[in-house]
UniProtKB/Swiss-Prot annotation:
The lineage of its organism: Bacteria, Pseudomonadati, Pseudomonadota, Alphaproteobacteria, Hyphomicrobiales. One of its GO terms (molecular function) is copper ion binding. It is a single-pass type II membrane protein. This is Cytochrome c oxidase assembly protein CtaG. The chain crosses the membrane at residues 13-35. It comes from the Bacteria. It comes from Sinorhizobium fredii (strain NBRC 101917 / NGR234). GO terms for cellular component: plasma membrane. GO terms for biological process: respiratory chain complex IV assembly. Keywords: Cell inner membrane, Cell membrane, Copper, Membrane, Signal-anchor, Transmembrane, Transmembrane helix. It is found in: Cell inner membrane. Exerts its effect at some terminal stage of cytochrome c oxidase synthesis, probably by being involved in the insertion of the copper B into subunit I.
Length: 199
């Protein structure tokens, strides 16, 4: 019989507790990083918090009933832009595909990049507001003094007239806020003087 040293039960228990605590902390850090994209995905799928839907094609059903859509524009701190809708509101037939324009101008003396966030109020209507094309899908860079018109193509889903929460809505507000962003950098940049056809 050999005498092999054994780890006392108390030390083994402490090691398990330390390992569990480290795993818990690592899990919490991972959840913190995943929370924003998961919440964004949840809002886009459900229309929660007035988040609009992104679609590839227009509605094939157009109702005679009309709904008023008003447009709102805001600029977050740190972005010296003038940003506004070209028209304040329109009356559209439910299901009709419509294009409206927003206008942005860089008031600063250097290039500035921004990206727009958006929502629809009343919030219950967000799931029925479908965007086919929108400047909010990508970031926008404006040179000093540059002015740009930016289209939004959308329709209000005819299903909005069915649920109790949305069937009596007569006015929607589409609101955008532009926030400053660092411009995206290309994944692989070619240095000056280098050829692109390297082996």
């Amino acid at each position: 019989m050999t005498n092999t040293p054994q780890t006392p039960p108390k030390e083994r228990a402490n090691g398990v507790i330390v390992g569990a605590c480290l795993a818990f902390v690592a899990g919490m850090v991972g959840m913190a990083y995943a929370a924003v994209p998961l919440y964004d995905m949840f809002c886009r799928v459900t229309g929660y918090n007035g988040t609009t839907q992104r679609v590839e094609q227009a509605s094939d059903v157009i109702l005679d009933e009309k709904i008023k859509v008003t447009f709102d524009a805001n600029v977050g701190p740190g972005l010296a832009w003038d940003f506004k809708p070209v028209q304040r509101d329109i009356d559209v037939r439910i299901g009709e595909t419509v294009q409206v324009m927003y206008r942005a101008k860089n008031l600063s003396s250097k290039p500035a990049t921004g990206q727009a966030t958006f929502n629809v109020t009343p919030m219950a209507a967000g799931a029925y507001f479908n965007k086919v094309q929108c400047f909010c899908f990508t970031e926008t860079t404006l040179q000093p003094g540059e002015e740009m018109e930016m289209p939004v193509v959308f329709f209000v889903d005819p299903e909005i007239v069915k649920p109790v929460e949305t069937k009596d809505i007569k006015t929607l507000t589409l609101s955008y806020t532009f926030y400053p962003r660092e411009p995206s950098k290309p994944i692989a940049a070619v240095k000056d003087g280098e050829t692109e056809n390297r082996l």
